[in-house]
Design a protein with these regions (language model features):
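Extracytoplasmic
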Residues: 1-29, 218-223
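Helix-loop-helix hairpin linking two adjacent transmembrane segments in secondary transporters
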Residues: 114, 123-170
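C-terminal membrane-cytosol helix-exit motif in multi-pass small-molecule transporters
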Residues: 158-178, 367-375
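C-terminal transmembrane helical hairpin of 12-TM major facilitator-type secondary transporters
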Residues: 258-311
Length: 392
C-alpha cells in the first residue's frame, strides 16, 4: 500500500510544484504539457513492456528492481536544471512506476484469501489517490519552508526504503508454470484475446483509458486551470489535493461495491462524474461550489479506477494476470498521456475552462458506456464463479 501511495504522490508532485518551477525557470503554463506527458509515456513502457516479465520470471525481483529505479530517479529529479532534464527524470521514474503497480496488483490478488481478494486489491489501489492527496499536503508544506527541489528530495529519500522492504517482506506469488494456464506456451498480449476474452479485454482497455485520462488530466492541470480562472494559488492547490482525497474515499466504496455488484457500479459512477464535471466548468472560480464538485468528481472517477483494477485482477487466469493488468493499465496510461497533452494544446489556443471541463465530461461518458459493456458480459455468463470473472 505504501508503494501505491508513492505512485499517486509522484504522479501529482509535478502538478503541485509546477507553478513554482514555472516561476523559477520563467516558463509559460503551456510548456508543462509535454513535461506532464513524458512521465506517463514511461508508465506505459513499464506497464506493457516490463511488468509482463513478472508472469515469466520472478515477480518479487521485478518489483525490487522497479522500486530501486523509482528511488534513484526521484531523488535525481531534485537536481535537474533544465526542462529537458526534468522530462528525462520523469520518463525514467515513470518506467519504474508503470512496472511496479501491475506487479503489486497481481501479487495482492494471488496472496489474498478467497472471498477477500476484492477488499485487498481495493485497499492497495485506493492508496494511489491517498498518496496524491498526501503529495499535495507535502508539496504545500515543502514550498512554504523551502523550494520545489526539497519536495523531490523528501520523496526520493522515502522511496529509498521500498527496495529494502520488498526484499524483506514481499511475496513473489506462484510461478506462472504452477498456475495451470490451460492454453500452454508463453503468455503474450494475444493471449488476452483468446478463449472469448476479446470483448472484455477491449472494454477494460476503454474503461482504463477514459478513467485514467480524466484522473491525470485533472490531476495535472487542475491547479493551473483554477488559477487561470481567477482563483488564488493556495485555494487552487488545496482543491486539487481534495480531488485526490475524494478519490481515496470514493475508491474504498466503489472498489468494494464493484467487487460485490460488478461493473454496473462503475458505469453509474462515471456518468455521475460526467455531470459534476460540467458543473465545475459552469460555476467558475467560486471556491465552495468548485471544492464540493471536485471532491465528488474525485470520488467518482479516480475512485472508479479502483473498481477497474479490482475487476481486471479477477478477469484473467493467474498465469496471465500481470500481463492482463499491465496491458489494461498501460493502455489506460495512453489516456494519461493524451489528456494532459490535449489540455496543453487547448490552453495554448485559448480554449475556455468550461470547454475543457466539457471535454473531460465526454470522456467520462465513454468510460461509463465501456463499463456497461463489461456488465453485459458478466450478466451473460451467470455460471461464472464469484471469485473470478472469466469468459471461457
Amino acid at each position: 500500500m505504501i508503494s501505491a501511495m508513492f505512485d499517486g504522490f509522484y504522479g501529482q508532485a509535478i502538478a503541485f510544484v509546477s507553478p513554482a518551477i514555472a516561476k523559477d525557470w520563467s516558463l509559460p503554463t503551456s510548456a508543462f504539457g509535454p513535461i506532464f506527458s513524458i512521465g506517463l509515456v514511461g508508465l506505459i513502457i513499464g506497464a506493457v513492456a516490463i511488468a509482463p516479465l513478472g508472469d515469466r520470471t520472478n515477480r518479487r525481483v521485478v518489483a525490487i528492481l522497479a522500486a530501486t529505479a523509482i528511488a534513484v530517479f526521484t531523488l535525481a529529479t531534485a537536481f535537474v536544471r533544465t526542462p529537458s532534464q526534468l522530462a528525462g527524470m520523469r520518463l525514467l521514474t515513470g518506467i519504474g512506476l508503470g512496472t511496479l503497480m501491475p506487479i503489486l496488483v497481481t501479487i495482492t490478488n494471488a496472496a489474498a484469501p478467497e472471498g477477500r481478494k476484492g477488499l485487498f486489491v481495493t485497499l492497495l489501489v485506493t492508496a494511489f489517490p491517498f498518496g496524491a492527496f498526501a503529495g499535495g499536503m507535502l508539496a504545500t508544506w515543502g514550498l512554504q519552508r523551502g523550494t520545489w527541489h526539497d519536495v523531490f528530495i523528501y520523496s526520493g529519500l522515502l522511496a529509498a526504503a521500498f527496495p529494502l522492504l520488498f526484499w524483506k517482506f514481499l511475496w513473489a506469488g506462484p510461478p506462472a508454470r504452477a498456475t495451470g494456464h490451460a492454453s500452454g506456451g508463453s503468455i503474450t498480449v494475444f493471449s488476452l484475446f483468446r478463449e472469448r476474452r476479446w470483448f472484455g479485454t477491449l472494454c477494460l482497455w476503454v474503461v482504463f483509458f477514459a478513467s485514467l485520462l480524466n484522473t491525470y488530466m485533472l490531476g495535472a492541470w487542475l491547479p493551473l486551470l483554477l488559477e487561470r480562472g481567477g482563483m488564488p494559488s493556495f485555494q487552487a492547490i488545496r482543491i486539487a489535493a481534495e480531488f485526490s482525497l475524494g478519490g481515496t474515499l470514493g475508491g474504498v466504496a466503489l472498489g468494494l461495491a464493484a467487487s460485490r455488484f460488478g461493473p454496473w457500479v462503475l458505469a453509474g459512477a462515471y456518468l455521475a462524474g460526467a455531470v459534476a464535471l460540467v458543473g465545475i466548468g459552469a460555476v467558475g472560480s467560486a471556491y465552495w461550489p468548485v471544492l464540493l464538485l471536485t471532491i465528488f468528481v474525485g470520488a467518482m472517477i479516480p475512485g472508479g479506477n479502483v473498481g477497474n483494477n479490482v475487476f481486471a485482477a479477477r478477469f484473467y487466469p493467474d498465469a496471465m494476470n500481470a500481463t492482463g493488468v499491465g496491458w489494461a493499465q498501460g493502455l489506460g496510461r495512453v489516456g494519461c498521456v493524451t489528456g494532459p497533452a490535449l489540455v496543453g494544446v487547448a490552453v495554448a489556443n485559448g480554449m475556455s475552462n468550461p470547454g475543457i471541463f466539457a471535454f473531460s465530461s465526454a470522456c467520462a461518458v465513454i468510460g461509463s458506456l465501456a463499463a456497461v459493456g463489461l456488465a453485459v458480459i458478466r450478466v451473460s455468463q451467470p455460471a461464472i464463479p464469484s471469485d473470478r470473472v472469466r469468459l471461457n
